[in-house]
Amino acid sequence: MDTEMMPKFSSKDEEIDYWKCLSLKYKKSCHDAQEELQEFQEGSRELEAELEAQLGQAEHRIRDLQSENQRLKSEVDILKEKLEQQYAQSYKQISMLEDDLLQTRGIKEQLHKYVRELEQANDDLERAKRATITSLEDFEQRLNQAIERNAFLESELDEKESLLVSVQRLKDEARDLRQELAVRERTSDVTRMSAPSSPTLDIDKTDSAVQASLSLPATPVGKTMEHPFIGTKALTNGCGNGSPLTPSARISALNIVGDLLRKVGALESKLAACRNFAKDQAARKNYTTGNGNLINSNATKFSHSLHTTYFDKTTMNGLDPGALSAAIASPRAVSPPGLLPLSV
């Protein structure tokens, strides 16, 4: 190839010059290559030393990193163990908290049920309280009415006692009047036989008419035992005041006796109504016994105080409580003897 590229020389000197120039050229390039090689070798040695230093540093760093990695691995293992322990503890704690939560929910539901039951019981108690208060107010109202009625009946009984005393007195006066009329009839018969045309004939006729109008029965045994000591002067004089009664006074006295007897009959009807009221009170008492222990206790206390007050009042009024209760409790279909009305 070189031979092909070799130029053709015309002379040997020209060829020698050519080859000299070429050898100088190659020698110079060889010298340059050697210098470059030497520089390259020096650079490579420096680079090798630098790389070896870097390699040592890298190996030292690798060893440090490996030790650090080993330490971190051990720490990771420790942390894993701690995490597992913490997870186990957390799981146990969560399980316990869930159990406590379930128990708390159950207790909460029970408390809600208990609260509802208490509210229902409270509503029932409030309704019972309102019913008890209503029944108690009704009972107090009826009891106050009964107290007022009993007070009215006490006054009526006091009036009846006074009227009975007045009636008994008037009966005694009427009996005395009948006896006086009988005596006057006998005296009038004697005077009529002695003096037929006496001016006192009209008065005797009036006395006989009054005696015929009197139809009172005899005084009952019980009442005569109450007044066993009647003076003889009262029997002879009528009223016991020392002066004989005129016919008009006798007729007015008989009218008063008739009015009093009618009042006594009205009082007997009121007494029968009082007995019926006592029966109604007994029935109401039996009814109120089923309204509960509270009403029963209050009613017992109130009725006890009423009973004490009632009989204290009767004692203060001069009445016998036993006789009064017996008179109210014992039913009498007919009037007692000696209380028949007068026919005037």
From Swiss-Prot:
| Principal place of residence | cytoplasm
Q: Which UniProt keywords apply?
A: Coiled coil, Cytoplasm, Cytoskeleton, Microtubule, Phosphoprotein, Transport
UniProt's post-translational modification comment states: Phosphorylated in mitosis.
Coiled-coil boundaries: 26-189
- GO terms assigned for molecular function: microtubule binding
List, in alphabetical order, the GO biological process terms annotated in this UniProt record: cell migration; centrosome localization; chromosome segregation; establishment of chromosome localization; establishment of mitotic spindle orientation; microtubule nucleation; mitotic centrosome separation; regulation of neuron projection development
Intracellular or extracellular location(s): Cytoplasm, Cytoskeleton; Cytoplasm, Cytoskeleton, Microtubule organizing center, Centrosome; Cytoplasm, Cytoskeleton, Spindle
Pfam entry (one): NUDE_C
Cellular-component GO terms for this entry: centrosome; cytoplasm; kinesin complex; kinetochore; microtubule; spindle
Q: Could you say which protein family the record assigns here?
A: Belongs to the nudE family.
- What function is annotated for this protein? Required for organization of the cellular microtubule array and microtubule anchoring at the centrosome. Positively regulates the activity of the minus-end directed microtubule motor protein dynein. May enhance dynein-mediated microtubule sliding by targeting dynein to the microtubule plus end.
Q: What is this protein called?
A: Nuclear distribution protein nudE-like 1-B
Protein's organism: Danio rerio
Query: Which classification does the entry list for the species?
Result: Eukaryota, Metazoa, Chordata, Craniata, Vertebrata
